């Protein structure tokens, strides 16, 4: 089953400095029938104006993954962590028992991100943050695991949940597959490009909730950049 969510039907808000679209209920957008997809709780599509951002604010008991589509995001938190994550790379934050952080676009151009929240396997624990560059060529034509709660994904950033976050790029006409498993919940968003997922067309920034599909087959109708969450 593929549940398509067109980008222009997503909830959202325009704060001037921040233009946000919400794949699931978030902040002022609330739909009791659209709260989550399995353990995936939030997928926000954010555009952040130059030299603006999110001032210090708290989080707890959530795995928060930021995928940078364009520009860069600079993170700073009360643990002393600081880092700049650029387009195509990810940062992860395990909020655990509580963390306070800020995220700013310190670049001269608009930064575009996907911010993904996944419920953890257990509450509490020491908070942590990490970021890592991923060679862009490695994900050409196939999915590469960027963040994972599984120990055998040794090259991925660790998260404390039964989930993976994956990225891929496809040239027009290319096809790739991913063995999801019928007991898993997948959510796929093309950051760019038009694709078909098991025969369902997705435009750029549309969402596709995927359940009861052992394997997903993605064909690029034009050059595409993909982000996939495989969650419980």
Curated annotation (Swiss-Prot):
InterPro entries: Pirin, Pirin_N_dom, Quercetinase_C, RmlC-like_jellyroll, RmlC_Cupin_sf. Gene3D superfamilies: Jelly Rolls. It holds the Pfam family Pirin. It comes from the Bacteria. SUPFAM superfamilies: RmlC-like cupins. Belongs to the pirin family. PANTHER family: QUERCETIN 2,3-DIOXYGENASE. This is Pirin-like protein CC_1473. It comes from Caulobacter vibrioides (strain ATCC 19089 / CIP 103742 / CB 15) (Caulobacter crescentus).
């Amino acid at each position: 089953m593929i549940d398509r969510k067109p980008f222009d039907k997503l909830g959202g808000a325009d704060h001037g400095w921040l233009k946000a679209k919400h794949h699931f209920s978030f902040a002022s957008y609330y739909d009791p029938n659209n709260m989550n997809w399995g353990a995936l709780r939030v997928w926000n599509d954010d555009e952040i104006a130059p030299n603006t951002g999110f001032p210090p604010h708290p989080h707890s008991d959530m795995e928060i993954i930021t995928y940078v589509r364009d520009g860069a995001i600079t993170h700073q938190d009360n643990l002393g962590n600081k880092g700049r994550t650029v387009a195509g790379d990810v940062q992860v934050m395990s909020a655990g028992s509580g963390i306070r952080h800020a995220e700013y676009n310190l670049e001269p151009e608009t930064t575009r991100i996907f911010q993904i929240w996944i419920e953890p396997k257990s509450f509490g624990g020491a908070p942590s943050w990490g970021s890592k560059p991923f060679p862009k060529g490695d994900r050409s034509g196939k999915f590469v695991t960027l963040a994972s709660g599984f120990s055998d994904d040794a090259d991925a950033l660790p998260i404390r949940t039964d989930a993976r976050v994956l990225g891929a790029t496809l040239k027009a006409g290319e096809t790739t597959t991913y063995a999801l498993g019928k007991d898993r919940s997948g959510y796929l968003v093309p950051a760019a490009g038009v694709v078909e997922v098991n025969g369902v067309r997705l435009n750029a920034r549309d969402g596709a909730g995927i359940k009861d599909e052992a394997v997903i087959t993605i064909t690029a109708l034009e050059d595409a950049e993909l982000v996939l969450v495989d969650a419980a």
